[in-house]
């Protein structure tokens, strides 16, 4: 599949998506969003892919939406623009396969919202993260008001959105915005190491973990616990469960097939 604004690479069970507009700091335009949509659909439908990694080329992960067109948007067009971007972020969050945002530099506005749609975020020490939309007289429109608040809490999320300030990688880790921060030189190695570790696990259980956690966040506790129990029963019908238990008893590494 050919793309203009992104690059994709299949590496064993891993699928790498690299935003490829480095001269624009990988800003999100309509073409990039459409190609990102197609790329994640491709990865989701490939049974060999176990983990999806999203990163950016050059010094930015993604500097947000391409604002050059903003003054020409009518209110109706702006609503559609926001809706389209948010739907793609929703799609990434709902993928059955684990996703990792490898934040190599600036993750601002829609770029941070893209990272927030991923399950795990690993950032370089040099990374700068923020939602600066307030400085344009607007506010986040790709899910940031909701996802950031759920990740770091209301107070810190409001401060980030109301000031538009960027925070460095070390503070992002302290806030829980990213899972870990590593030197830029080690970023790809550490991301690949984590992705390969996850890729060895049962795809069915990984998908159910995502489903139960994501749905449980917006449900009463008892509903989330009930969903957890139902999913736990489901995995007992799988070949992966049999393989995992057998491997443990036989003191060997399991080989999960996603069945």
From Swiss-Prot:
Listed EC numbers: 4.2.1.116
pH-dependence of activity, as noted: Optimum pH is 8.1 at room temperature. Retains half maximum activity at pH 6.5 and pH 9.5 at room temperature.
InterPro entries (alphabetical): ClpP/crotonase-like_dom_sf (IPR029045), Enoyl-CoA_hyd/isom_CS (IPR018376), Enoyl-CoA_hydra/iso (IPR001753), Enoyl-CoA_hydra_C (IPR014748)
Pfam families, alphabetized: ECH_1 (PF00378)
Catalysed reactions, semicolon-separated: 3-hydroxypropanoyl-CoA = acryloyl-CoA + H2O
Keyword annotations of the record: Fatty acid metabolism, Lipid metabolism, Lyase
The keyword Lipid metabolism belongs to this UniProt entry's keyword annotation: yes
Listed GO MF terms: 3-hydroxypropionyl-CoA dehydratase activity
GO process annotations (BP): fatty acid beta-oxidation
Domain of life assignment: Archaea
Enzyme class: lyase
Annotated catalytic residues: 113 (nucleophile), 133 (proton acceptor)
SUPFAM superfamilies referenced in this protein's UniProt entry, alphabetically: ClpP/crotonase
Subunit structure: Monomer.
Protein family membership: Belongs to the enoyl-CoA hydratase/isomerase family.
Function: Plays a role in autotrophic carbon fixation via the 3-hydroxypropionate/4-hydroxybutyrate cycle. Catalyzes the reversible dehydration of 3-hydroxypropionyl-CoA to form acryloyl-CoA, and the reversible dehydration of (S)-3-hydroxybutyryl-CoA to form crotonyl-CoA. Inactive towards (R)-3-hydroxybutyryl-CoA.
Record's protein name: 3-hydroxypropionyl-coenzyme A dehydratase
Source organism of this protein record: Metallosphaera sedula (strain ATCC 51363 / DSM 5348 / JCM 9185 / NBRC 15509 / TH2)
